[in-house]
Amino acid sequence: MDITELLAFAVKNKASDLHLSAGLPPLIRVHGDIRRINLPPMEHEDVHAMVYDIMSDAQRKMYEEMLECDFSFAVPNLARFRVNAFNQHRGAAAAFRTIPSKVLSLEELNAPKVFAEMTNRPRGLILVTGPTGSGKSTTLAAMVDYVNQSEYGHILTIEDPIEFLHESKKCLINQRELGPHTLSFPNALRAALREDPDYILIGEMRDLETIRLALTAAETGHLVFGTLHTSSAAKTIDRIIDVFPAAEKDMVRAMLSESLVAVISQTLIKTKDGQGRVAAHEIMIGTPAIRNLIRENKVAQMYSAIQTGQSFGMQTLDQCLIDLVRRNVIAPSEARTRAVSKEIFGAA
């Protein structure tokens, strides 16, 4: 099989990822589980050639110099893929993450209504958080698509690499990728403030300067979407504050309390029928009470504020899990593995 055939096989089998690793057969990840494809082990030269064939000259140069490389790659009429090529003790390797060619709508994702409502804000910061592979990019793409279909504005994305491709509908959309289009997130964000955007999507808020510029953009009249790898709203607030030096923490708390629209922390859970995965969300909305807790550094009290904030569209992860179990979407045993209060779902 060549690389296109392997990727087509992965998509046909609803795999989220394809793994090539010298010394092993190709593997796919389906509904969270790694499975081997019934093929012979691949040699280093096979994997190296497959990866090299789909790289540009600049990407090959980076791979040779840095020993790893991130890029995106499209197979016409199939899908786009986010690729990381790297080296391991048996030889060359690569991980391909499937990016569906169709952007799913918020309705198709069965997203809570508050997801659409929060995109109507004229400015502020919306954070979608969770571990790698939790569907953050899919949720953000659906929110961007909702804006694209309902508002007349300029959406600017800064990604590493570009994942979902958006067509300009009611909005003008400009998508920028680290490497080909800009040298860094901070460079692109500084330039963004002079590019007349209404909405800015930051693929990953990974360092102090990016976070600082995101807060500034949110404060100065832009609706900013960003991601972090944190697992809850409270941990997200802590992570942002902790990045800054002690002398700046109070100022950052004040900025964050003024600009925060929402934190959506999500995880993917296997469905009861075994046919897929469903997103479970913790949702924290920037209400006056939440803003006050951020300003006064009372992060520990956020969980109870979220618990009692359902009228604002808030929910804890456990409240979401209870609803999914009641609707027979997931099994109680599966909910228990993700729950904060595991006793709610009975003994293991």
Where do the PLM segments sit?
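Short, flexible helix-loop junctions that flank or precede catalytic/ligand sites
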Residues: M1-A348
